[in-house]
Amino acid sequence: MRPLMLQGHERSITQIKYNREGDLLFSCSKDQKPNVWYSLNGERLGTYDGHQGAVWCLDVDWESRKLITGAGDMTAKIWDVEYGTVIASIPTKSSVRTSNFSFSGNQAAYSTDKAMGQSCELFLIDVRNADSSLSEQEPTLRIPMTESKITSMLWGPLDETIITGHDNGNIAIWDIRKGQKVVDSGTDHSAGINDMQLSKDGTMFVTASKDTTAKLFDSESLMCLKTYKTERPVNSAAISPIMDHVVLGGGQDAMEVTTTSTKAGKFDSRFFHLIYEEEFARLKGHFGPINSLAFHPDGKSYASGGEDGFVRVQTFDSTYFENIFE
């Protein structure tokens, strides 16, 4: 099970994401330049050059035509995936922390940080006819976050709702037609949420939190279904599209890391059974915390992006699929 090591970033990885078919893997980091890789052999296909600050988030649309990125230079940019050109650059008043295309690809949502006297806000834009004029247009929806800033975000079914994860551990569902909150999870997590990822059918999602747990939620009622416990903050978690498995990645906060030993087990990818909540495997590799995880859409491999600036793509052995959990 030899991993592909993708080395194209000079600083730590902030997010990685596969497109729908899984042939492309997108990565962004604090070095200002998102990359796109051919996931089969790890070849770098291109770089999206244009941001002036750390890129915090990215998402690719259903057809792999458009890419949206959000960065610390106070812009969200929409790119042409194939040509690497900027279609639109949208100025904001603080760093863009999350960005996602809707399933239809007609809309995109992004959220800004609570910083420099600005409150955290959630924005919706229409990207059907995205061009340079998008920077002057008003967003179709703008929701100020009065309590805690958004740290991760997902689109709900039929593009009618947005699920937000917050810095205080709250999760909320927003109706985008009414522009108001419809469901609040309360305090299932006791610390900030670092990442949220949907299951393949969208009926549930997994959260990764600083409170050292990952949890499985129903995406309509926000009922907590399962809890996966670790000893360290969880930075990212993903659900396998074909097996009842969840992978967790994390480690200490970046500023608390003093050792770079891979033997300590701090920086492993940890596999849990989705239903039984039991850990059954660990994979070593990164010299530092794992910041982002993603399963390949076919479920036969997964990728991890770390604080060490590497993206590792691991293909599973046949024993992984034959292993019956008892």
Swiss-Prot record:
SMART domains: WD40
Homology family: Belongs to the eIF-3 subunit I family.
Key words of the record: Cytoplasm, Initiation factor, Protein biosynthesis, Repeat, WD repeat
SUPFAM superfamilies: WD40 repeat-like
Pfam families: EIF3I
One BP annotation, GO: translational initiation
Placement of WD repeats on the sequence: 8-47, 50-89, 145-184, 188-227, 285-326
InterPro entries: eIF3i, WD40/YVTN_repeat-like_dom_sf, WD40_repeat_CS, WD40_repeat_dom_sf, WD40_rpt
GO MF, one example: RNA binding
Protein name (database record): Eukaryotic translation initiation factor 3 subunit I
GO CC, alphabetical: eukaryotic 43S preinitiation complex; eukaryotic 48S preinitiation complex; eukaryotic translation initiation factor 3 complex; eukaryotic translation initiation factor 3 complex, eIF3m
Subunit structure: Component of the eukaryotic translation initiation factor 3 (eIF-3) complex. The eIF-3 complex interacts with pix.
Localization of this protein: Cytoplasm
Principal localisation: cytoplasm
General function of this protein: Component of the eukaryotic translation initiation factor 3 (eIF-3) complex, which is involved in protein synthesis of a specialized repertoire of mRNAs and, together with other initiation factors, stimulates binding of mRNA and methionyl-tRNAi to the 40S ribosome. The eIF-3 complex specifically targets and initiates translation of a subset of mRNAs involved in cell proliferation.
